Curated annotation (Swiss-Prot):
Residues that bind Ca(2+) 1: 28, 33
Domain EF-hand: residue ranges: 12-47, 50-85
Function description: Calcium-binding protein that plays a role in various cellular processes including motility, angiogenesis, cell differentiation, apoptosis, and autophagy. Increases cell motility and invasiveness by interacting with non-muscle myosin heavy chain (NMMHC) IIA/MYH9. Mechanistically, promotes filament depolymerization and increases the amount of soluble myosin-IIA, resulting in the formation of stable protrusions facilitating chemotaxis. Also modulates the pro-apoptotic function of TP53 by binding to its C-terminal transactivation domain within the nucleus and reducing its protein levels.
Annotated source species: Canis lupus familiaris
The protein, known as: Protein S100-A4
Assigned GO CC terms: extracellular space; nucleus; perinuclear region of cytoplasm
InterPro entries the record matches: EF-hand-dom_pair (IPR011992), EF_Hand_1_Ca_BS (IPR018247), EF_hand_dom (IPR002048), S-100_dom (IPR034325), S100/CaBP7/8-like_CS (IPR001751), S100_Ca-bd_sub (IPR013787)
Gene: S100A4
Gene Ontology process terms (BP): positive regulation of canonical NF-kappaB signal transduction
């Protein structure tokens, strides 16, 4: 039996490795790999924005060790931040249905 959180972790890891190493280090996302991942896997996050300056700023913010690539740890920090933003967004809505047990 697969549990939802285990499945989520599997998807998180496998998605990273699906895009990493297409052009270089197989354990890191370069600029174009990250952009492809975001466009294909998180299109709602980018929305209609294809602003190159905004993407460059995101890349710069994610690349904490300044090697011009995003490693798995940096990727996880990014996903954690996105998850926290989603949680904060939904905290503003009143509960209309009882919580599942």
């Amino acid at each position: 039996m697969t549990f939802p959180l285990e499945k989520a972790l599997d998807v998180m890891v496998s998605t990273f490795h699906k895009y990493s190493g297409k052009e270089g280090d197989k354990f890191k996302l370069n600029r174009s790999e990250l952009k492809e991942l975001l466009m294909r896997e998180l299109p709602s996050f980018l929305g209609k924005r294809t602003d190159e300056a905004a993407f460059q700023k995101l890349m710069s913010n994610l690349d904490s060790n300044r090697d011009n690539e995003v490693d798995f740890q940096e990727y996880c920090v990014f996903l954690s931040c996105v998850a926290m933003m989603c949680n904060e967004f939904f905290e503003g809505f009143p509960d209309k249905q009882p919580r599942k047990k």
